[in-house]
A protein has these predicted regions:
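Thiamine diphosphate
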Residues: 1-124
Length: 124
């Protein structure tokens, strides 16, 4: 509808894994998009469920079900033809977003965050 305006998406790394092939699709179709990835190396929304499955405690078995090997999504984006920007400190984010918005091509902002920073449960 408005190809000159970028679509901005925020996702976690676990969710991004489900749709990572769409970066190549966006490059091929020249879709002006910016994807901000909260890259903490795990599917933190799943943590509590896996803990419950293992008796309510964080065990090595439970942890291996929701954590991932380290990934540089910015480098992966570049390999697919998109703009990849890695952000490792909060002060880098504003510049990264400005650069991505001006790119006029698919851009992935890979924001490295702390896996131990788990949001409070929305429901109990």
């Amino acid at each position: 509808a408005c190809p000159q305006r970028p679509v901005v998406t925020f996702t976690g790394d676990a969710g991004f894994w489900y749709h990572i092939a769409e970066v190549e699709t966006a490059v091929r179709w020249k879709i002006n998009s910016v994807t901000v990835v909260n890259n903490n190396g795990g599917g933190n929304q799943s943590k509590r469920g896996f803990d419950r499955a293992y008796g309510g405690e964080q065990t090595a078995q439970a942890r291996e079900l929701w954590t991932y090997n380290p990934m540089n999504f910015a480098r992966l984006a570049e390999d697919m033809g998109a703009l990849g920007i890695r952000v490792e400190t909060p002060g880098e984010f504003a510049g990264a977003l400005a650069r991505a918005l001006k790119a006029d091509r698919p851009a992935i902002i890979d924001v490295v965050t702390d896996i131990e920073a788990i949001a409070p449960a929305a429901v109990s």
